[in-house]
């Protein structure tokens, strides 16, 4: 049953009860009876405001109250944001697929260039999605050329968000360990840095034949909001015309590119799905490789979190899983980490202990009051490492001489087969008298 509509007369009754001292003492039926006489004496002009108020009350009543979630947000607004996010995600996937398919259609997929970018940050604003950047790195990549260029810079934002020093210290100490502002490293002129980054990205994209399109960079799934927030922070401090920088998911690019590469190589790709490629991407084979991060992170053993190392490792992962399908020869420093001389020495366990000392140490010899110094490194000889069995246990488990107890066990009582009709019960040492006494015991 629909709700009853408001009437001008009832609006007049409610107002009269609120304003009249006599009306406040009356019940609703009494007030209706009293106001009925007054309503009859009123003309159309006097009744107009009450009739208008009744129509407005009907409109308000028809408007449903918006449902809220546990955070006090309107459910319709939350659902609208979710739909918009899903649409943006689908649009991003279509654009990534279009980029890869265009290169495949031109038979030039191995020369299609992509820009990989990553940010390290100090902290995130609580009220919005702005991140305070600490380090930036970007590189240009193609399957044939590998990592062709690199841009890397530390960033000094000058100051942190008030009240977030503890969160910033906790985050940085567990990740990149860069010094906090105002002692941060790198460029302090944010506007100049933003212009420099845009020039580099535009130069890479213009070389790919896309001068008028938005700048597109790829980063890992977990870093997509970080890269967007850091670019937004850099834009806010720049007086230049802001560029449209779109941040795409590199892991979806990895999946699409792998399938198309296998299709070009005429290899079956039905078993390739995003879960497999994501697992390959997350299990970073080059994660702890040295010599590919910035000097600060190399000195502090934090190369895993360095942005320069991240973008380089992404290039190496793409090359490692795809160049072989296209018969592209990998080059050190382009498709794989540069070769490095080993900084260790293999020691033969059979070598005397005096020859295992550090090469920098010296020995002192005294002869007839004269002291001479001789470097131990001159006494060391080049040793070829041989595999030596260091097992502490070398006995034969089946040899009775090594384990005398193997042959000392007692034989089984019924080793021989029993005769037919003989019970397989062990012999009892009890006499007949003992058995009889057992049956005659009093029972409780």
From Swiss-Prot:
Cellular compartment(s): Cytoplasm; Nucleus
Q: Which residues bind DNA?
A: 2-69
Tell me yes or no: is Nucleotide-binding among this UniProt entry's keywords.
no
InterPro entries with a match to the protein in the record: HMG_box_dom (IPR009071), HMG_box_dom_sf (IPR036910), Maelstrom (IPR024970), Protein_maelstrom (IPR039259)
State the Pfam families in the record. Maelstrom
SUPFAM superfamilies per record: HMG-box (SSF47095)
Q: Which GO terms describe its cellular component?
A: cytoplasm; nucleus; P granule; perinuclear region of cytoplasm
Q: Which GO terms describe its biological process?
A: germ-line stem cell population maintenance; male meiotic nuclear division; negative regulation of DNA-templated transcription; oogenesis; piRNA processing; regulation of miRNA-mediated gene silencing; regulatory ncRNA-mediated gene silencing; spermatogenesis
Function as written in the Swiss-Prot or TrEMBL entry: Involved both in the piRNA and miRNA metabolic processes. As a component of the meiotic nuage, plays a central role during oogenesis by repressing transposable elements and preventing their mobilization, which is essential for the germline integrity. Repression of transposable elements is mediated via the piRNA metabolic process, which mediates the repression of transposable elements during meiosis by forming complexes composed of piRNAs and Piwi proteins and governs the repression of transposons.
- Its recorded name reads Protein maelstrom
């Amino acid at each position: 049953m629909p709700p009853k509509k408001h009437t001008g007369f009832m609006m007049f009754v409610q107002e009269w009860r609120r304003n009249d001292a006599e009306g406040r003492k009356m019940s609703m039926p009494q007030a209706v009876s009293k106001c009925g006489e007054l309503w009859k004496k009123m003309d159309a002009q006097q009744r107009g405001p009450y009739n208008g108020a009744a129509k407005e009350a009907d409109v308000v009543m028809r408007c449903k109250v918006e449902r809220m979630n546990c955070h006090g947000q309107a459910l319709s607004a939350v659902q609208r944001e979710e739909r918009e996010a899903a649409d943006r995600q689908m649009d991003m996937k279509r654009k990534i697929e279009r980029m890869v398919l265009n290169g495949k259609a031109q038979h030039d997929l191995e020369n299609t260039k992509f820009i990989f970018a990553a940010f390290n940050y100090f902290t995130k604003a609580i009220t919005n999605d702005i991140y305070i950047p600490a380090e930036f790195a970007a590189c240009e990549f193609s399957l044939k050329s590998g990592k062709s260029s690199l841009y890397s810079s530390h960033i000094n934002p000058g100051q942190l968000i008030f009240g977030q020093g503890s969160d910033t210290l906790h985050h940085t100490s567990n990740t990149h360990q860069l010094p906090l502002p105002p002692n941060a490293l790198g460029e302090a002129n944010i506007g100049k840095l933003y212009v420099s980054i845009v020039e580099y990205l535009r130069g890479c994209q213009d070389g790919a034949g896309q001068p008028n399109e938005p700048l597109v960079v790829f980063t890992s799934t977990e870093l997509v909001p970080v890269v967007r927030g850091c670019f937004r922070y850099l834009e806010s401090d720049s007086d230049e015309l802001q560029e449209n920088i779109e941040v795409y998911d590199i892991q979806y690019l990895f999946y699409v590119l792998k399938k198309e590469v296998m299709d070009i190589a005429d290899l079956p790709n039905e078993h390739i799905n995003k879960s497999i490629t994501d697992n390959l991407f997350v299990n970073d084979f080059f994660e702890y490789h040295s010599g590919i991060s910035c000097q600060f992170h190399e000195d502090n053993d934090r190369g895993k979190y360095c942005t320069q190392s991240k973008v380089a490792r992404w290039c190496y992962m793409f090359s490692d899983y795809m160049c072989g399908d296209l018969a592209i020869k990998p080059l050190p420093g382009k498709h794989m980490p540069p070769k490095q001389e080993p900084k260790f020495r293999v020691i033969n366990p059979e070598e005397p202990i005096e020859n295992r000392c550090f090469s920098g140490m010296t020995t002192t010899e005294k002869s007839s009051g004269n002291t001479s110094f001789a470097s131990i490194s001159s006494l060391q000889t080049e040793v070829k490492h041989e595999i030596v069995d260091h097992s502490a246990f070398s006995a034969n488990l089946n040899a009775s001489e090594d384990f005398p107890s193997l042959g000392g066990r007692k034989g089984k009582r019924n080793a021989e087969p029993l005769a037919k009709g003989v019970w397989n019960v062990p012999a009892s040492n009890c006499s007949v008298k003992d058995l009889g006494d057992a049956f005659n015991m009093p029972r409780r």
